[in-house]
């Protein structure tokens, strides 16, 4: 009897398996690539639930060698957005089968399949071209309607930043004439015409003057902390030049120039000593220091519904190394200065586009707008997206405007691959992992969100 029951269960299971195979084999014809992918995932989930229901109650759940549940046996009690290592392996295999050519994605609404005659090669190429142009047109429409900032808004925001920079420069020279500073200057995506959606932030770089014989920079990877992309600024020759020989000795902590202490020094000036309401009235702006934790940020209301945030960013230059006081996400690294790569990255991107009238910057701005408008992608930074484009530019030579859709899809696929590996090397300094400050959970959520949209990228344009 037991044997008969076992055979019966096996027969039933084979029947369900046959039905599932039939549904999946015909799903793509009816639903297209995106629909087939989603149906496959849902069908697999139902089959797993059925398998568990008919299995013995005491049978243990199969675990992977690492002790975690595998992609084949998902943890139903966990978050669907957190992918363990085995699930990432399955994700990698799945990526190999997904299409990357924009012509693969049918943007038309669903209609019943009809018998079609065998098309000639020219007709097939024409259809692919039309589908590619459909995605291309949607990307361009998204850029015009959602990503691009009106020229007038950009000009007014830049003028507000210039006015405040001039006032701050005059105040520091008058009140702190002994503070060794070079001329402040504006930087950031708004200044470089790479900002999207709204003109709402810019950086004010404040260069400190350091004596070259009293200070040196030590790469983070050469320290016990082993943090590439960050530096320690060490005070040198204290036996010959005692404390007080440099103005910035007051900001030394444990023998190193502390970016946190430097930032605190400027915070007292920016937030505590300057009468911003009076300056705002003079300039016809509403100016106030941003609340914590944005200690070195000014919020400027330059129109009724327009706000600009100005980040006050101290900077030091030693030799060819430019560092900024932008802290690491982890508090234990608050004594480290961040290596400034953004100016060089932007210059390379601009040079590449100027050389061939390419669409690299346009593709980057569309990606930035998507991430800015999609909360689940909010952890991706402009620097990370810029480096994805720079890496892709090394692989692909043709960046003519009509290739925008193809390059956009390749950038999405490349970004998912970097997230899967947990490593995005800097295009200018490969030792620097631009994902190093993301947590595993953040990386998994980003990868999950992008992977789910890869079969139907138009979804990203609807946020």
From Swiss-Prot:
Membrane topology: Single-pass membrane protein
Residues recorded as bearing Phosphoserine in the entry: 55, 59, 79, 94
GO CC, one annotated term: mitochondrial outer membrane
Residues exposed to the Cytoplasmic side: 47-463
Highest taxon, organism lineage: Eukaryota
Principal subcellular localisation of the protein: mitochondrion
Keywords, alphabetical: Membrane, Mitochondrion, Mitochondrion outer membrane, Nucleotide-binding, Phosphoprotein, Transmembrane, Transmembrane helix
Substitution effect: residue 342 to E: Abolishes nucleotide-binding, but not DNM1L recruitment
Sample GO molecular function, one term: identical protein binding
SMART domains per UniProt: Mab-21
Region feature (Dimerization): 49-195
Disordered, as annotated region: 57-77, 96-123
Parts forming coiled coils: none
Expression tissues: Expression is relatively high in heart, skeletal muscle, pancreas and kidney.
Function field: Mitochondrial outer membrane protein which regulates mitochondrial fission/fusion dynamics. Promotes the recruitment and association of the fission mediator dynamin-related protein 1 (DNM1L) to the mitochondrial surface independently of the mitochondrial fission FIS1 and MFF proteins. Regulates DNM1L GTPase activity and DNM1L oligomerization. Binds ADP and can also bind GDP, although with lower affinity. Does not bind CDP, UDP, ATP, AMP or GTP. Inhibits DNM1L GTPase activity in the absence of bound ADP.
Disease: Optic atrophy 14: A disease characterized by visual impairment in association with optic atrophy. Atrophy of the optic disk indicates a deficiency in the number of nerve fibers which arise in the retina and converge to form the optic disk, optic nerve, optic chiasm and optic tracts. OPA14 is an autosomal dominant form characterized by adult-onset progressive reduction in visual acuity, and pale and excavated optic disk. Optical coherence tomography discloses a severe loss of the retinal nerve fiber layer.
Listed name of the protein: Mitochondrial dynamics protein MIEF1
Gene symbol of the encoding locus: MIEF1
